Curated annotation (Swiss-Prot):
Name under which the protein is recorded: Small ribosomal subunit protein bS6
CDD domains hit by this protein: bS6 (cd00473)
BP terms from Gene Ontology: translation
Record family assignment: Belongs to the bacterial ribosomal protein bS6 family.
HAMAP family: Ribosomal_bS6
GO-annotated molecular function: small ribosomal subunit rRNA binding; structural constituent of ribosome
Keyword terms: Ribonucleoprotein, Ribosomal protein, RNA-binding, rRNA-binding
Annotated InterPro entries: Ribosomal_bS6, Ribosomal_bS6_sf, Ribosomal_S6_plastid/chlpt, Transl_elong_EF1B/ribsomal_bS6
Lineage: Bacteria, Pseudomonadati, Pseudomonadota, Gammaproteobacteria, Lysobacterales
Region (Disordered): 97-144
S-S bonds: none
GO cellular component term of the entry, any: cytosolic small ribosomal subunit
Basic and acidic residues biased stretches: 105-124
Length: 144
């Protein structure tokens, strides 16, 4: 007996380039078990509400699917044994959700303004480079 589920999983940000392959693997698992995918959204890298494994960002993917329990169990087990998947959430739904999610609607309305994406990229680069330690005089601590 097939039921409707909403599945969200978070992927390690260093593995973002492998997300399309992961999605294809999960799609083939669902469709191979006579399941249906009603909605598939790749939300991209987003800020986490709290750090997970000392990470502040993760790659989000949303699926609305209709599968039976055996396929769902196999899908959840594949999430659990994949080290790149940081977290996953499965919610039982009453029916299929095919319309665009609120996150994707707001993303389309805002658009990704070039100056905003440039600022995000610059902030990411600055966050990766550790600033040099300074003493109270403003000189480098190593020079003292």
């Amino acid at each position: 007996m097939s039921r409707h589920y909403e599945v969200v999983f978070l992927v390690h940000p260093d593995q973002s380039e492998q997300v399309p392959a992961m999605i294809e693997r999960y799609k083939s698992l669902i469709e191979g078990g006579n399941g249906t995918i009603h909605r598939l959204e790749d939300w991209g890298r987003r800020q986490l509400a709290y750090p997970i494994q000392n990470l502040v960002k993760a790659h989000y993917v949303l699926l609305n699917i209709e599968v039976d329990q055996a396929v769902l169990s196999e899908l959840v087990e594949s999430f659990r044994f994949n080290d790149a998947v940081l977290r996953h959430l499965v919610i039982k739904r009453d029916g299929p959700d095919t319309e665009q999610s609120l996150i994707m609607k707001s993303k389309d309305e805002k658009g990704d303004k070039p100056e905003r994406s440039e600022r995000r990229r610059r902030d990411d680069e600055e966050g990766d480079a550790a600033p040099a330690a300074t003493d109270t005089d403003g000189d480098n601590a190593e020079a003292a």
